[in-house]
Amino acid sequence: MTLQDQIIKELGVKPVINPSQEIRRSVEFLKDYLLKHSFLKTYVLGISGGQDSTLAGRLAQLAVEELRADTGENYQFIAIRLPYGIQADEEDAQKALDFIKPDIALTINIKEAVDGQVRALNAAGVEITDFNKGNIKARQRMISQYAVAGQYAGAVIGTDHAAENITGFFTKFGDGGADLLPLFRLNKSQGKQLLAELGADKALYEKIPTADLEENKPGIADEIALGVTYQEIDAYLEGKVVSDKSRGIIENWWYKGQHKRHLPITIFDDFWK
């Protein structure tokens, strides 16, 4: 078995999907989790205005609406805007919320918390790079989401999918630190298919993907940061042949991000050796 085959198997990616079936699969997954954990009544998710949070948010809203209808209990979905100061693409985030139609929409500006943390570190003699500050932003967003979830008997939804997972393109214990991943198994183009099936405006899934964490590189496209396109990543995940250069980049990211795919390492773990 090649490394490509191993990765595809581990991430559960199918070369071809039925969008309506995958929507139902994710919704049922989200419903089952709440039903299994009777102390939970809420899903929480940060909404950026990008493809992934838009899709996960709509799936979460559908799940709680069906649960309310099925059980008569007050399940809910809380969508949270988490800008750092003023977000350049705030209009996109609002369009995403209009599409998702969450039960509750909150806005928590993380700028004061992030800047305070950076000042405290600087005062201790630790100079924080712009890249590192970007990771602080991602982790602060998750701190806020878990704070809300803790107050409302909730679980936090993550947006990690196969194209993001294979490259490790997420912050460890930041956007990578969630309770459930309803998009896991889907690559980037398959996520677009689900949004199209759900009737989303094309603008919500055709915009250029960006983590937008670095102030020195505002809005830098994921594909530039990764050095490979999502089309090539998706092709790799679907078992297709990609160029040697792209294969090398993708597999290097896979190895580099292995530690992000595991809980804290114990003496019994050997994946890193």
Curated annotation (Swiss-Prot):
GO biological process, one term: NAD biosynthetic process
Binding annotation for ATP: G46, I47, S48, G49, G50, Q51, D52, S53, T159, K188, T210
Pathway(s) this gene product operates in, as recorded in its UniProt entry: Cofactor biosynthesis; NAD(+) biosynthesis; NAD(+) from deamido-NAD(+) (ammonia route): step 1/1
Binding site for deamido-NAD(+): R139, K172, D179, H259, K260
Cited function: Catalyzes the ATP-dependent amidation of deamido-NAD to form NAD. Uses ammonia as a nitrogen source.
Family label: Belongs to the NAD synthetase family.
Coiled-coil stretches: none
Keyword ATP-binding applies: yes
Enzyme Commission identifier(s): 6.3.1.5
Molecular function via GO: ATP binding; glutaminase activity; metal ion binding; NAD+ synthase (glutamine-hydrolyzing) activity; NAD+ synthase activity
Protein residues bound to Mg(2+): D52, E164
Species in which this protein is naturally found: Streptococcus agalactiae serotype V (strain ATCC BAA-611 / 2603 V/R)
Claim: Transport is one of the keywords in the record: no
InterPro entries noted in UniProt: NAD/GMP_synthase, NAD_synthase, NH(3)-dep_NAD(+)_synth, Rossmann-like_a/b/a_fold
Gene Ontology CC entries for this record: cytoplasm
Entry protein name: NH(3)-dependent NAD(+) synthetase
Keywords, in A-Z order: ATP-binding, Ligase, Magnesium, Metal-binding, NAD, Nucleotide-binding
Catalytic reactions on record: deamido-NAD(+) + NH4(+) + ATP = AMP + diphosphate + NAD(+) + H(+)
Subunit structure: Homodimer.
Pfam families, per database record: NAD_synthase
